[in-house]
Each structure stands twice: as C-alpha cells, then as structure tokens.
From Swiss-Prot:
Molecular-function GO terms, alphabetical: heme binding; iron ion binding; monooxygenase activity; oxidoreductase activity, acting on paired donors, with incorporation or reduction of molecular oxygen
The keyword Transmembrane helix appears for this protein: no
GO biological process: antibiotic biosynthetic process
Function statement: Involved in the biosynthesis of the naphthoic acid (NA) moiety in the chromophore of the enedyine antitumor antibiotic neocarzinostatin (NCS).
Catalytic activity: 2-hydroxy-5-methyl-1-naphthoate + 2 reduced [2Fe-2S]-[ferredoxin] + O2 + 2 H(+) = 2,7-dihydroxy-5-methyl-1-naphthoate + 2 oxidized [2Fe-2S]-[ferredoxin] + H2O
UniProt binding sites for heme: 350
Protein name: 2-hydroxy-5-methyl-1-naphthoate 7-hydroxylase
Length: 410
C-alpha cells in the first residue's frame, strides 16, 4: 500500500486518522520532501512504543537520513530534529536534563503559582471585557494563547520586550506549511533569539528558570551550551502549545453544547470532567515527531526497520474504538472512561502536565463565569484549521462575548 501523505494544512485531522486506521494500528506516511515515516494511532501499540527502549528519541544517533545529511536545515520539520533537548535524548542524558527542571513543576511549586495565574487570568478577562458589545473577539488570540505564553515567559524570566522574538520561532515550529527557506531562516533566527536571551539573563539574573539553568551550566552541571539553548527552545516554544489548544477545544465544546455548559457551570458536572474529555477527544497534539527504531522488529502487525522514524498520532489515540467503543468521536463529559495519552507515557511524560491542568482549572471556569452569555460568532464548520499536522487546533475562535442579542442591540 502506498504511503499516506499527511496534509501540511492539517485541515482534517480526525478524517486523516480514520483513513490511516483502515491500514491497521500503524500506517506508513509521507512527510514533506518525500520523507517516509510511520504513524501510530492505536492506543495499546502507542503506549507500548512510548515505553519501549528500542525506540529512541535521538536522531543524532539513530536516524541515518539525518546523520548522512539527507535532511537539510530547510526541511519544514527540522527544528523537531536539530534541537538538542530532553525531547531528543534518551537514558542518562534525558534524565540529567529532566532533573534540572523537576523542581519547577512539583505539585507544591505549581500550587504556589495560583495567585499569579489568577492575576494573569483576571488581566486577560479585563482586556476582553473592554471590547465593545458588538465587537467580535478572537478568544484564542486574546485568552487561550495569551495565558500559557505569559505564564511560561514569566516562569523563565523573559523580559516583555524580548517575548515576541522568542515566541515567534515556536509558532513557526508547529507550522507544517512552512517553506524550506522559511524553515531554515527560522532555525537560525530562533537559535539567535534564545542565545540573546541567555546572554541577557547572564547579566541580569533573576528568580526564574532561565537564570537557574544558566547557573547550573556555569557551575559545571554537564549542561552544554546546545542543551541550554535547546531546553529553552523546547519549553518556551512547544511548551505552551498543548495548553493553548486544550483551552480552545474545551471552550468550543462548551460553546456548542448549551446543555453541557449549563450542567458544568452549575456544578452538576465537575470541571475536571471537561478537562479530561477534552484531552481524550481533542488531543491538543496531533502527529508528534519523532521516535526512531534502533533495530529491526515487528510491532502492531508491521515490520519496522532500524532507523525508521515514527510519529505518535495523539489525536487518534484518544478516539481508538478498541478503548472507547461507545461513540469514541463524541464529546461526553460523563463518559466513565476518559483514558488518553495526550501528555505522553513513560520517561518522556510531559513535564508541564501538572501546570497545564492547574492553569486550565483556573482559567476556563473564570472565562465562562465572566462571560456567561458568550456565543460563537461563526458556525462551527466555518472554523479553520491551524495549518499543522503536528498540533490539533483552530486558527481562531471568534465569539460574541455577551451573546448575539447584545451585539445586534448596538
């Protein structure tokens, strides 16, 4: 069977998964520039792969095409490969890098951030409330994207005047429509922006994670310059995207289902149910690059060759009919089993999962309490995709904050 070419536009994430599922638990896919890989969308097989040491995260040791120079700096997915981060390391090196960040994401540390998160949420909601009643507001831009990026930039001590250039690389990093020229330029510009941030923080240290990482580097913790830069790339770039789309997808679910919204806001259905079901039915991440086979073997009924790259289709895993036999594509906040793998599994489980949930549990209830009459300003089928097969999201989420009636009354 011919490889299935993933759509760089990401226009039909779940439709693609349905077509791939017809080929079995793992399907052959074609990426940009004809690069071949495997996509796994089966829950059991994906969980096995994420815990199997025969799959490495390190392309520098295990992807022949990259090692041999066949993958250029202009490849649209190059930043997922070239960056030296804990997401591209295995074993002791991965553990060493992860350990440097663990203290920042403990339950106690995350809970201590509550006042700051609440203050940030209030500021964002106040900004939205200042809009005219008849003005259409993109809540993805003004709230869903702003909350995570502000929190991450605050956590890492990124000065306000440097945030735009630091965050720009992350936005381009998930855009799978990007041209070769733009991809290569982004790789260089993003590295330069992060390097400039590190140099600034060396001279202006603070009580933040960037300063702590620099101190660890300078005190001989075996953190290399490339690892320092790569770690900041990972957390300031991709680090906030999961929460951005989790916020947006859950808001959309509540906007299109008045009965669900009433039951949740009244307390009949717990908010945490919406959080978990959102992660299951609309995983914020779609096809996440990459894992690499370190030997030949068979899994999921297919033969994987040594060096083959693999993407995990998190958007498909949560809808696996073998796990969720009862209407897996439907959002059901009362579903007894909301099993998903949206934050990963095994040693690479998302470090920021606890913080993401904490921010969501503060932000989304506050959003719907502040704007109880909020309505979509377009039909659901008019919402456009984000332009990526790496993440699962919409380009925007336009609403009338006080409802259509208030807008029409102006």
């Amino acid at each position: 069977m011919c490889p299935y070419r993933l759509d760089p536009e990401g226009a039909d994430t779940h439709g693609e998964t349905a077509r791939l599922r017809e080929q079995g638990p793992i399907a052959r896919v074609e990426l940009q520039d004809g690069v071949l890989a495997w996509s796994v969308h089966d829950y059991a097989v994906a969980k096995q792969i994420m815990a199997d040491e025969r799959f490495s995260k390190n392309p520098r040791k295990n992807w022949p095409a990259y090692i041999n120079g066949e993958i250029s700096n202009g490849w649209p997915l190059i930043t997922w490969v070239a960056m030296d981060t804990m997401a591209t390391q295995d074993g002791a090196d991965h553990a060493r890098l992860r350990k440097l960040l663990l203290k920042a994401f403990t339950e106690r540390r995350v809970e201590s951030m509550r006042p700051h998160i609440e203050k940030t949420v209030k500021e964002l909601l106040d900004n939205m409330a200042a809009k005219a009643d008849d003005e259409i507001v993109d809540i993805k831009e003004m709230f869903h994207a702003e909350l995570p990026t502000r929190l991450m930039c605050d956590l890492f001590g990124v000065p306000e005047e440097r945030r735009a250039e630091v965050l720009a690389g992350g936005h381009k990093n998930i855009d799978t429509r990007i041209s070769s020229e733009a991809a290569e330029a982004n790789l260089g510009q993003w590295q330069e922006a992060i390097s400039d941030l590190v140099e600034y923080k060396r001279h202006h240290p603070g009580d933040d994670l960037t300063s702590a990482l620099i101190e660890a580097r300078d005190e001989g913790s075996r953190l290399s310059d490339s690892e320092l830069i790569g770690t900041l790339h990972l957390l300031l770039g991709a680090g906030s995207e999961t929460l951005v789309n989790a916020l947006a997808h859950s808001s959309l679910a509540l906007l299109v289902d008045a009965d669900l919204r009433k039951k949740v806001t009244s307390g009949e259905i717990p908010w945490v149910n919406v959080w978990e079901e959102t992660l299951r039915v609309e995983s914020p991440v779609a096809h996440l690059p990459f894992r690499y086979a370190t030997e030949d073997f068979e899994i999921g009924g297919v033969k994987i060759s040594k060096g083959d790259p693999l993407l995990v289709d998190f958007a498909g895993i949560g809808r696996d009919p073998a796990v969720h036999s009862d209407a897996p594509d439907e959002f059901d906040a009362l579903r007894p089993d909301k099993t998903h793998l949206s934050f990963g599994h095994g040693v690479h489980y998302c470090l920021g999962a606890r913080l993401a949930k904490h921010a969501w549990m503060i932000g989304i209830p506050a959003l719907f309490e502040r704007f109880p009459d909020m309505e979509l300003a377009v039909r659901r089928d008019e919402l456009k995709g984000q332009g990526s097969f790496v993440v699962n999201g919409h380009a925007s989420l336009p609403v009338h904050l006080k409802g259509r009636a208030a807008a029409l009354a102006r």
